[in-house]
Amino acid sequence: MRHFWIAGLVGLVACGGDKDAEGTDTGGGTTDPTGCTNSISETFPADGTADAYYRTGVEFTLLTAEADATIAVVDGAGAAVAGTSMVEGNVVMWMPSAPLAAATAYTATLSYSCDDASISFTTSDVGAPIGDSASLVGNVYALPLTEGRFVEPPGVGEILSGLLTVGVLIEVTSADASAITMMGAVAAESDPNAQDLCTETIDFPTAADFSENPYFQVGPDDTVISVAGISIAIDDLAISGAFSPNGDAIEGAALSGSIDTRPLVPLVAEGQGDDGVCNLVATFGIPCIECADGSGPYCLALKVDSMSADQVPGGDVVQRTADDVANDPTCSGT
């Protein structure tokens, strides 16, 4: 497993990785026959996407960074859509000033040193408000981390998605027109729709603002997940997304937080100190950050987006405290 991690990490960071959710990857790009030496290696969303998230941004990944590159977006009628274009490294990004309309066609055009390039996409029906917020209460949704787009740490998403062996369950515990409360749980490794009763539940301490119905964001809170069979702490876990019109799914789900790398040292940097993983990723320009507990710069920022969380029929999240887990004989050895 250690050699898999190192080989994969080197390959993905050095070469740019593989296809991400809803993105296209041309494997390094091609040069323009007119003589332009730059090219587009990936876009997000993919050209022709028919179910884009209504709060999505647009990204064009270039072979070579261009500080002056820009993106403009128009709707199906050709009207300009307000937004901000920016460049981070070799990625040109555009974010809308307001959420896009549901079930609407858009075209994004990149202007850079080569000829302008465009992609087209259509948003899904997600975006219309839930008529009765209370109808969401009791619904449980399964969030599959392995199916998301790993935005951070950059370049190593394929490795993390291959090692994350569990998902997250989210239950709506109360909801009204302005706020929504949720409780989370780590899913069992054997069944992504079942709760791991030997792990404490994620008790988000603050209700989420639901004034942008159907969009919500809940958290932050701390939890533990399994990576290659090792328990890893995630600090400041926050989850966001938007409910589908009939409440049977959460679309555009995103998860963010910071992951403690120290338990991964035996897998990735055997024989090294607490900073073994951080030293390795630093050689590829990926910095570790200070952990939330103040113990040192041993954590990596984690962000996963573009997930769909389907409702679990008959699902139920049972609140579990540390004492519950400790006193449960079936949890011995966990």
Predicted segments with their positions:
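Small side chains
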Residues: 8-11, 23, 27, 83-85, ...
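Surface-exposed charge patches in extracellular/virion surface proteins
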Residues: 2, 19-22, 55, 88-90, ...
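Sec-dependent signal peptide recognition
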Residues: 1-8
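Extracytosolic secretory-pathway proteins
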Residues: 126-334
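Acidic, low-complexity Ser/Thr/Gly/Pro-rich repeat segments typical of extracellular/periplasmic
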Residues: 34-130
